[in-house]
């Protein structure tokens, strides 16, 4: 299960919390969208992929050419290890972790079941982004994700996003293994691939043709 970029390569990807956001993503030019299930680590054994709805609700998406519909699990982790049943992991295309402590960040970077380490950028990080942990994650094929939704309307959040993004871009060799994501079910927060590419350039990502969303 590693190398999340391989699952999305040559295609812009967007994580969505609603079908409406997914529809807007496709209209903006994204080639794959992921509907996201979010849970705490204690609830992960009961996690199930969200339903895309009745066929009539997603007819445009399911018949769209070159569009991939993905299922994503995002686990909020505050413990030094992640324990999610394999049958749960197998039900999803992408497994992401939002670490909330230093130990959780270290665990997410080293766990082979984790595709994405999702860093919440709406406030100051509750853990240190250590170079050695980042290198462990990149070596095994995982990627780091920063979300821009909060930064759109809140200047303070934009400062946190910029600081975190610059740090991760520097530690990932110019943004290799860095994913920029909306991270919101609100359609108005979804930005086009070109807008996200501009943000990536601002953060020091040298190649903005990679995975953004």
Residue locations for each model-derived region?
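Charged catalytic cores and adjacent phosphate/nucleic-acid-binding surfaces used
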Residues: 1-35, 41-59, 63, 84-86, ...
């Amino acid at each position: 299960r590693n190398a999340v970029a391989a699952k999305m390569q040559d295609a812009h990807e967007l994580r969505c919390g609603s079908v409406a956001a997914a529809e807007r993503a496709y209209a903006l030019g994204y080639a794959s969208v992921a509907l996201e299930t979010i849970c705490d680590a204690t609830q992960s054994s009961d996690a199930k992929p969200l339903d895309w709805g009745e066929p009539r609700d997603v007819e445009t998406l399911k018949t769209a050419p070159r569009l991939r519909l993905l299922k994503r699990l995002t686990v909020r982790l505050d413990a030094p290890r992640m324990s999610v049943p394999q049958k749960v992991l197998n039900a999803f295309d992408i497994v992401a972790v939002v670490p909330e402590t230093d130990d959780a960040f270290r665990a997410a970077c080293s766990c082979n079941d984790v595709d994405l380490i999702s860093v919440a950028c709406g406030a100051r990080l509750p853990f240190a982004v250590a170079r050695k942990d980042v290198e462990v994650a990149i070596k095994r094929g995982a990627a780091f994700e920063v979300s821009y939704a909060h930064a759109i309307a809140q200047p303070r959040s934009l400062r946190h996003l910029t600081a975190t993004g610059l740090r991760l871009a520097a530690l990932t060799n110019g943004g290799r293994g860095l994913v920029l994501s909306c991270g919101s079910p609100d359609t108005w927060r979804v930005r086009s691939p070109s807008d996200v590419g501009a943000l990536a350039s601002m953060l020091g990502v040298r190649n903005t043709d990679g995975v953004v969303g």
